[in-house]
Every structure is written in C-alpha cells, then in structure tokens.
Design a protein with these regions (language model features):
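N-terminal glycine-/serine-/threonine-rich phosphate-binding loop
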Residues: 24-90
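C-terminal functional extensions of proteins
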Residues: 42-45, 268, 275, 282-350
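Glycine-rich phosphate/diphosphate-binding loops that line cofactor/substrate pockets in enzymes
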Residues: 50-64, 200-204, 248-258
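Glycine-rich anion-binding loop/nest that anchors nucleotide
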Residues: 64-73, 93, 209-213, 233-308
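Short acidic, glycine/serine/threonine-rich loops at helix termini
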Residues: 76-79, 104-110, 220-224, 273-276, ...
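A generic, well-ordered mixed alpha/beta core segment in the N-terminal half of proteins
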Residues: 85-152
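Ligand-binding beta-strand-loop-alpha-helix segment within the catalytic cores
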Residues: 126-217
Length: 350
C-alpha cells in the first residue's frame, strides 16, 4: 500500500510517475538545457535560433544538406557527424576532397598524429623538421604522411585499377565507399568505427558530392598515376558529373518542405552545391524548382573585399539561391566549437 501511494501520489498537482518521467526526459537533454539557459545573445543566440530552425525543418518533413569546408575531419567532427548520419538528420553531404580522405586518415593512423599546441611559436626550421619527420601540419595537428596517406594509397589504387580494367567509372566518394565496405582498412582501425563519419556514410550509401576533389592528396595521387600512364583520367567521374548527379537528386527531393542547406565554413564545398538551384531555374528553365528552404552558415569570414564566404545570407537572394521567406541564419564563430553543440541540440530534439 505504501508503494502504491508513493507511485501514485501527486507532486505539485502532477502525478508522481509523470513528474519523474518529465524530470528524466528533461535530464536527457543536457546540451539543450545548457544552451537555452546561457546562449541568449549575439552569436550565441544565433546558434540557438539556427539549431531550432534545423529541428523545425526536419520535423516538418524537410531534408538537409551539410557542407564541410576547412579541416573538419582532422578536427574529428566525425565523432558527432557520424551519429547525425546514423540517425537520419542529414540527407546529403558536400565536402572537400581533404575532408573526404582525412576522416579515413584519422581512422587508420590516429595514434601517429601529433598535436603541436604551441604552433604559433614555430620557426621556419621547426616546420622543416616536421616535414623531414613526415608530418604535415594543420594548425595544431600534424598528419603522419606514411601511416595515413600511404596506408590508404595502396588499397585505393588497386580499386581504381580494378574499375578501369572492367571499364567502370565512379565518383571519388564511391571509390572510397568501395574501399571502406571491402573491409581492407579494418586491420588499421585506431579509433572506434562509430567515430568515423565516412564509415557511417558508406554504410548508409549517403549521397555525396566532392567538388574540386583534384585539390586533395588522393586527387594528386590519382593524377600521378595518369601522368605515368597507369590510369586514365576518365576512370574518375568529373565535377560536371557531380553537378548533374546533384541536380537529379535535388529535383527528386525538393518537394514538400524542401531541402535545407547547413554550411560549415565557406569555399567550394558550399559554393558548388548551392548553385544547383539557380542552374535548374535559369539554365534548365525549371521555373517551379524550389529555393533552398533553410539556410545556416557557421563561418569566421566577414563581409569585406568581395568575400563570398563572408556574405550575409540575403545576398544569395539576388543570385536565385534563397527565397525571401527562407529561414536564414549565420553564426560568426569557430565551427569546431559551434557545430558539435548544434548537432547535439539537433540530436536531442529532432
């Protein structure tokens, strides 16, 4: 009887069990609680507003593209981006060739990376010494050339050559997916597989575009094999084919609530895919094609001297990319700080 009264008594007029479940539910959203309590003004408030907008877009049935510029994979954003992919909070990714490969480099060579927290104090000789040790620096993080690049190279080259021998052609990300799903890299794994966004993407067969892939380590390696006559450039599908691939996907997926655009950084990873809308509208004369239906950019770039990456979202209206009514957000801050918080909020609420 005592147990009965304990479970079914009221607390402030609320049944005890309902009170407890509400507390548990509230406690299960620590990031939401934190940012809604303390992130109240300026860029902090913009972060909250943009996160809420992302959640609302998904709840209304919309789809979302995330674009990755900078060194997000080396920053290990994959730890939380992988979960976003697994939980269906992202439907398409556009990234640089560096982000495509550096997630896998971290996967197979993590223990060989070196942090250089005092990087601002390095002399030219210090930088040369890092080079001679086979370490390529990205701000405070050094990527080990032999363990990272070469471990991938010997396997990806085999896959390139095998495809060419069969007369097959694939996109850069499709070749990476083949390598991941073949299992040949598992012998090298140095981080939990759930922390790799590329593994999550490969397993979900997530659509990806990699504009300017040639500007990457694997792109350079592929070019070297073409120069040596061991591969044909046509074995790798081109950037133009990436645009037609994206155009087909956008046309099929932009109905209803439409597709949102979540841009991390600037550069080609964002510039390339956002142009699919004006291309379809103006060049294909598809006048019923919807604009991007949500827009957010995290960037430390400012509007000056013709900077496209630092342009305010409204400028994109003049280019036929966003509508007047498109929810628009810009968080002028460091993506390595903001993106994990925003993704955590989205995972807790969407």
């Amino acid at each position: 009887m005592l147990l009965y009264h304990t479970f079914f008594r009221c607390v402030d007029g609320i049944p005890f069990l309902s009170f407890i479940f509400a507390k548990i539910k509230k406690m299960s959203k620590p990031i939401t609680e934190f940012i809604e309590k303390y992130y109240l003004h300026f860029n902090a408030a913009a972060l909250v507003d943009a996160s809420k907008g992302y959640v609302a877009h998904l709840k209304d049935g919309g789809k979302m593209m995330i674009t990755l510029a900078g060194a997000m994979s080396t920053a290990e954003l994959g730890k939380i981006l992988a979960e976003m992919i697994r939980q269906g909070k992202v439907d398409f990714i556009s990234c640089t060739g560096a982000n495509l490969e550096e997630d896998l480099m971290n996967l197979v060579a993590h223990s060989h990376y070196e942090r250089v927290p005092h990087y601002r104090d390095l002399t030219a000789q210090d930088e040369w010494d890092l080079l001679e040790r086979g370490l390529n620096r990205v701000t405070d993080t050094c990527i080990p050339e032999e363990e990272a690049f070469r471990r991938l190279q010997k396997h990806i080259v085999e896959i390139w050559k095998d495809a060419e021998a069969k007369g097959e052609r694939y996109f850069p990300h499709e070749f990476m997916y083949k390598m991941i799903l073949s299992g040949v890299l598992e012998q090298y794994y140095e981080i939990p597989r759930e922390n790799s966004w590329m593994i999550a993407a490969a397993e979900a067969n997530l659509p990806i575009v990699v504009p300017g892939w040639e500007d990457s380590t694997m792109g350079n390696i592929f070019a070297s094999y073409c120069i040596k006559g061991e591969l044909k450039a046509t074995t790798m599908k081109s950037g133009i084919e990436y645009m037609t691939y994206l155009a087909d996907w956008y046309t099929k997926n932009s109905g209803g609530k439409g597709v949102g655009f979540f841009q991390i950084g600037g550069g080609i990873a964002g510039d390339f895919p956002i142009c699919v809308v004006p291309m379809l509208y103006q060049d294909m004369e598809m006048h019923d094609i919807p604009f991007w239906s949500y827009f957010c950019q995290i960037s430390d770039s400012t509007t000056s001297y013709g900077s496209y990456s630092g342009a305010v979202p409204n400028e994109k209206i003049t280019w036929g990319k966003l509508d007047i009514t498109t929810p628009k957000f810009i968080v002028e801050s460091d993506a390595t700080i903001c993106a994990p918080l925003m993704f955590s909020y989205i995972l807790e609420n969407a």
